[in-house]
């Protein structure tokens, strides 16, 4: 039986949204056990008596909040829901770690407590984002786990993302592109020029450089980038999408009868558009390169994205993604 350790106190809607998502996922994931860490009384009162099978609750007395400095927090708040859950995974009692809490602290838990895979230079954070070309979206790695990068790191990140796209997204031969400031192969600074050469020499389906305007068009299944650029890109995409949706809603609903009628007529198309750019169904961002799946979902998440993230984690465990990484990087050393 697979076991997922869950920080039940992370995020704005904890613990209710987390418990509700577990209860929703439980009938579908019949071979999975859920261990929730946090305020035992609050968590237990949300779980009906008839639903307590395959759900364990472990009491913790502290919570890492967003304003906490990540590394200091995991050292000082040793009885926090996130740290205790991470140690539970490290001990082998659980197979994966999931949290909606402080991103930096979760990355620190993954790297310093659960530990990186031998042969992996630097773990990296990777979400799946929507694209206009495909309902499958695209992966972008790294989006902030590393402030500084080397060309060799980008190659390993591309290799890990390639495995993920194959095993979890069911893409037989994923296309991989390097985020750069031009399409030509000599574009970019020394880091990107060397990364380009190294990626081209691998057996990946590397299609060259991708510019910022290519991402949402779906030029590649996997986009590899340094952590600084990736983080800025992710926030720009999220912010732009949020503003466009807000402006669209405001223009349709707050400008009289005619736009409202138009919105009603356009509803099927708008529904399809909303579905295409619905990030919840992709699950959370994954810290790749550590000894167990470590997955982060946005702190504002409600039941739906949490539910899909639980399905995502379960598939990662079923496909033994970490085992594939360990085998690959041990053989390539």
Curated annotation (Swiss-Prot):
Q: Which Pfam families match?
A: FA_synthesis
Q: What binding partners and quaternary form does the record give?
A: Homodimer. Probably interacts with PlsY.
Name the Gene Ontology biological process terms. fatty acid biosynthetic process; phospholipid biosynthetic process
Native organism = Lactobacillus johnsonii (strain CNCM I-12250 / La1 / NCC 533)
What's this protein's name? Answer: Phosphate acyltransferase
Kindly give the HAMAP family that the UniProt entry links to this protein.
Answer: PlsX
Q: What is its EC number?
A: 2.3.1.274
Family stated for the protein in its record: Belongs to the PlsX family.
Please give the function described in this protein's UniProt entry.
Catalyzes the reversible formation of acyl-phosphate (acyl-PO(4)) from acyl-[acyl-carrier-protein] (acyl-ACP). This enzyme utilizes acyl-ACP as fatty acyl donor, but not acyl-CoA.
